[in-house]
A protein has these predicted regions:
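Long, structured ligand/cofactor-binding scaffold of large enzymes
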Residues: 1-183
Length: 183
């Protein structure tokens, strides 16, 4: 099956606005922003991770890292890795493990991009239909309740958050912030 899981057929497909087919896909338009205005972007859309210029930081490390040497403090130009991992279908089917392995893919891609990087923190964003956690919310009554094929929105929001943070914590990348959008 050729799913939307990693291929992003929607972003790479034909993009139509008001019945007019656009010359670029949505993904091509997103890439064009970085091409025309790179600002501090060092690398993007390669290795499944982007790198941007970071601040100058103090590093406490061996003077010569190729051999045993004394430690010193020195200023180092840093590079920040930026990564988003979509794991929509796996998280819908099994939220804890789907989001957990999404975090794993994000960590893997950061560590494997360019010369590699050191993941230090993660974020997560969850978007679902109304979770209907309580009765009597008028905004949720606009749409009829439906049967869910895999998990309910409430199950996804709770279990996916637990899975993403569990995996990140085990690999030294705590989940430090996130966002929830229900509609």
């Amino acid at each position: 099956i050729n799913s939307e899981h990693c291929r992003h057929k929607i972003f790479g497909g034909t993009f139509v606005i008001d019945g007019v087919e656009q010359e670029s896909s949505l993904f091509q338009m997103i890439k064009k922003t970085t091409q025309e205005n790179p600002n501090k972007i060092i690398s993007a859309y390669k290795d499944n991770v982007a790198f941007a210029e970071g601040p100058v930081i103090e590093q406490f490390a061996p003077a010569d890292q190729s051999k045993s040497d004394y430690f010193q403090i020195k200023d180092v130009k840093s590079v920040i890795s930026l990564k988003a991992e979509t794991h929509n279908f796996p998280t819908t089917v099994e939220p804890f493990n789907g989001a957990s392995t999404g975090t794993g893919g994000e960590i893997r891609d950061r560590m494997g991009g360019g010369k590699g990087s050191w993941p230090i923190a993660g974020t997560a964003v969850y978007m679902t239909s109304y979770p209907r956690t309580e009765e009597g919310r008028p905004w949720e009554e606009i749409l009829p309740v439906r049967k869910w094929l895999y998990q309910t929105p409430e199950q996804i929001l709770i279990k996916a958050s637990n899975g993403a943070s569990d995996f990140g914590n085990k690999f030294g990348q705590p989940l430090i912030c996130g966002s929830v959008l229900t509609f």
